[in-house]
């Protein structure tokens, strides 16, 4: 028995440790973590996207296709089964919440639209149009009405834009056909996505080309329609345009539609892979052609209500089409750009963006543009689906594919304003894509085997990340940038293959930007219209608004500065960053933080219409000691290094000081507020100390006794005016105006 037991134990003990280690150790492997992450993303995504994307029939049909293509039969089946607009469920719910939060009645919405149009017409044509009060600026309610009412409103604001009943009935039928065509196109785009975002898909690229060409054609039609509407309005109110310029769109609608129907990307390819899509876009363009005939041939009512009713109906039509086109562009930026050859540098995408930018340049005062980040906060399903699909693709491929890296590099080149240098490309290692969990190594890096060089680890000195920030040298030309100076959203850092940080940008949260529920607007100064077809659409010509996915409890409007390279353009889920996240506080309390070596940094992060805080309302440069208004020779020279950059908003004082008329000192002193601090980067502590000491010395050595305020006021009342009409005063940074010597002697004699 003992021998048998001993023999049995010997046999069992041979692989006991191996079996226990393999079956008993539960330490997760990287593959386990990736699988769990993919499944978690799938569970979240299934609840907020259209059910047809995860249907059994679609999954089985795509499983037997060994290419990254989706046949049109699968797309058509998903479109037919989605009878309740399931693809738009999340977005439509958020839009209706925004409309409900406006608390505006039907008549108040009417007033919002008509007042907005009168202001737009006055600024675009120069006609003397009476504006009945302010438009309410760019508040949340106004922007919600202008963007969402025509698409998700319960009923139309203006039902009878024409004079006779027949044209009104035909117009209602055309609107229903147009909405049906828009829904079919949006469904097609929603369900045409392949399963792998990191693999090229030629069929999907062709369909995207067809959609983007369709967007370009529609935006050109909108410019033609606004030319027609503005001309008829001015004619009906017996006004003529003061600003004379050519038509904003020179081609007639029939030529625009014919050009797309005969030579569009889907028709020109001749493959038939986008036959259903080309039919849907053709249906929408034909309806627009019928509407062109209606608005051209049918007359309006001659009374005031008839003209305003036609205006409101026209604005409703424009916002309906514009919202549909924005849906297509924002969906491309939310993920579909990965299937475009060249990424954001694709020619069809650039053409569509230019058309949208041109429309915004001329009509942006009337119709705003929604940023992709705001759109993604409302349409969460598309962004979440692409995160899930990318995670699953990385697990399958093991690393990002070259095709996907090319798309990422095209986006990075737009963000930095120039192409990345040679060698600074995204690596195929997932660690090359930094996120919120990335952190520097906490110890020396081990040297590879048989290596003669030791692994080194160098900790960043305090402030080194801040000083190494590289700002864009020029603002991106993409229309998705709402400012002249590019504002930066998201906390991202593009790294090269050596791991060196090449760009460190701030989160939009540092500009008081609410990442998830932004309920603000981005107003800006808009330049005059131009009739040139080659006019560039700079970043100062786009008005971005941001809508919350749920109504704001306070109703406050947050004016902020959104991102912009392709703003549109950043990951839709950045996290707010601590303003001091790029600076590590030193242990030594006497340590003085080094100043940034980038002189242009402060000015590049400011908006084009930025008004400096507490800027003096006189033509002297901020930071200089105050002098007499009449005696310009007493203006002291600015300390070395205190001058702002040439392109700064405060560098216009010298020119103003030459030609500006004399300013009354009473007015100057009443409106002047001392500057809290000098914001120039090169204005160091030494210069501040010297300036403060000189001012203190001037106060100590000031001649003459100090009189009480009562005597001073009594003397001013009894003083006779001089030949120049007022008593000369000297501006001081520390006290009230000093008196003229003659005035001081008179007060002393009293």
Curated annotation (Swiss-Prot):
Task: Say which family it is in.
Answer: Belongs to the herpesviridae HHV-1 VP11/12 protein family.
Q: Its biological function? A: Modulates alpha trans-inducing factor-dependent activation of alpha genes.
Pfam families associated with the record: Herpes_UL46
Cell location: Virion tegument; Host cell membrane
Q: Is Membrane set as a keyword in this record? A: yes
- Protein's UniProt name: Tegument protein UL46 homolog
GO CC annotations, alphabetized: host cell plasma membrane; membrane; viral tegument
Enumerate the UniProt keywords alphabetically.
Activator, Host cell membrane, Host membrane, Membrane, Transcription, Transcription regulation, Virion, Virion tegument
UniProt main location, coarse = virion
Q: Which residues form the signal peptide?
A: none
Q: Which domain of life is it from?
A: Viruses
Any single GO BP term: regulation of DNA-templated transcription
Tell me which InterPro entries the record gives.
Herpes_UL46
In this chain, composition skew of type Polar residues spans 465-484, 541-553
Task: Cite the residue spans of the region called Disordered.
Answer: 437-484, 525-593, 610-669, 692-750
Which residue windows does the record flag with biased composition (Basic and acidic residues)? Answer: 710-727, 739-750
Q: Where are the transmembrane segments?
A: none
Q: Specify residue ranges for compositional bias: Low complexity.
A: 528-540
* Membrane-topology annotation of the record: Peripheral membrane protein
């Amino acid at each position: 028995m003992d021998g048998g037991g001993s023999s049995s134990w010997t046999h069992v003990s041979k692989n006991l440790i191996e079996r226990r280690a393999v079956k008993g150790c539960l330490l997760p492997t990287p593959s386990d973590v990736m699988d769990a992450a993919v499944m978690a993303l799938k569970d979240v995504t299934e609840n907020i996207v259209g059910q047809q994307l995860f249907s059994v029939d679609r999954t089985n049909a795509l499983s037997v296709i060994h290419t990254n293509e989706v046949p049109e039969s699968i797309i058509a089946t998903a479109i037919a089964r989605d009878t309740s607009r399931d693809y738009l469920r999340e977005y439509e719910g958020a839009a209706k919440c925004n409309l409900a939060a406006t608390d505006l009645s039907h008549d108040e919405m009417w007033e919002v639209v008509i007042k907005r149009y009168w202001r737009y017409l006055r600024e675009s044509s120069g006609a003397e149009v009476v504006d009945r009060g302010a438009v309410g600026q760019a508040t949340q309610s106004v922007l919600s009405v202008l963007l969402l009412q025509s698409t998700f409103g319960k009923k139309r604001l203006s039902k009878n834009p024409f004079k006779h009943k027949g044209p009104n009935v035909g117009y209602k039928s055309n609107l229903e056909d147009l909405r049906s065509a828009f829904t079919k196109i949006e469904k097609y785009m929603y369900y045409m996505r392949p399963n792998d975002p990191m693999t090229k898909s030629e069929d999907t690229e062709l369909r995207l080309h067809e959609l983007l060409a369709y967007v370009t054609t529609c935006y050109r039609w909108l410019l033609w329609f606004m030319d027609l509407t503005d001309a008829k309005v001015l004619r009906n109110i017996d006004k003529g345009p003061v600003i004379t310029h050519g038509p904003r769109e020179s081609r007639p609608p029939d030529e625009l539609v014919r050009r797309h129907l005969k030579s569009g990307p889907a028709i020109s390819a001749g493959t038939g892979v986008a036959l259903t899509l080309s039919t849907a876009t053709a249906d929408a363009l034909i309806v627009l052609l019928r509407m062109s005939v209606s608005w051209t041939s049918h007359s309006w009512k001659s009374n005031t209500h008839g003209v305003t009713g036609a205006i409101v109906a026209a604005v409703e039509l424009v916002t309906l089409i514009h919202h549909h086109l924005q849906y297509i562009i924002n969906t491309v930026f939310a993920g579909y750009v990965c299937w475009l050859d060249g990424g954001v540098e694709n020619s069809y995408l650039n053409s569509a963006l230019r058309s949208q930018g041109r429309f915004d340049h001329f009509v942006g005062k009337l119709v705003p543009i929604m940023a992709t980040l705001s759109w993604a906060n409302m349409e969460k399903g598309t962004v979440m689906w692409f995160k899930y699909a990318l995670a699953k693709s990385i697990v399958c491929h093991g690393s990002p594919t070259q095709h996907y890296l090319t798309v990422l590099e095209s986006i990075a080149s737009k963000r930095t304003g120039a192409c990345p240098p040679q060698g600074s490309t995204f690596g195929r290692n997932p660690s090359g894509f930094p996120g919120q969990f990335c952190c520097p190594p906490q110890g020396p890096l081990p040297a590879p085997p048989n290596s003669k060089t030791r692994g080194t680890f160098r900790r960043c000195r305090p402030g080194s990340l801040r000083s190494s920030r590289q700002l864009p040298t020029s603002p991106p030309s993409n229309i998705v940038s709402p400012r002249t100076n590019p504002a930066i959203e998201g906390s991202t850092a593009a790294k090269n293959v050596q791991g060196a940080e090449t760009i460190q940008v701030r989160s939009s949260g540092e500009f008081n930007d609410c990442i998830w529920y932004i309920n603000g607007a981005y107003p800006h100064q808009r330049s005059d219209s131009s009739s040139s077809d080659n006019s560039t659409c700079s970043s100062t010509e786009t008005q971005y608004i941001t809508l919350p996915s749920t109504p704001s409890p306070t109703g406050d409007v947050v004016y902020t500065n959104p991102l912009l390279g392709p703003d549109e353009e950043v990951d839709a889920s950045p996290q707010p960053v601590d303003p001091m996240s790029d600076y590590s506080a030193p242990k030594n309390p006497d340590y003085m933080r080094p100043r940034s070596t980038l002189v242009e940094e402060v000015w590049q992060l400011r908006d084009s219409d930025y008004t400096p805080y507490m800027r003096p309302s006189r033509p002297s440069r901020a930071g200089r000691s105050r002098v007499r208004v009449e005696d310009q020779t007493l203006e002291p020279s600015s300390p070395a290094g205190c001058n702002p950059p040439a392109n700064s908003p405060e560098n216009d004082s010298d020119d103003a000081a030459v030609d500006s008329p004399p300013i009354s000192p009473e007015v100057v002193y009443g409106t002047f507020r001392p500057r809290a601090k000098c914001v120039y980067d090169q204005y160091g502590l030494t210069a501040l100390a010297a300036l403060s000491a000189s001012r203190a010395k001037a106060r100590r050595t000031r001649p003459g006794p100090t009189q009480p305020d009562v005597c001073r006021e009594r003397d001013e009342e009894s003083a006779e005016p001089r030949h120049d009409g007022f008593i000369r005063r000297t501006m001081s940074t520390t006290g009230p105006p000093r008196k003229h010597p003659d005035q001081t002697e008179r007060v002393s004699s009293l």
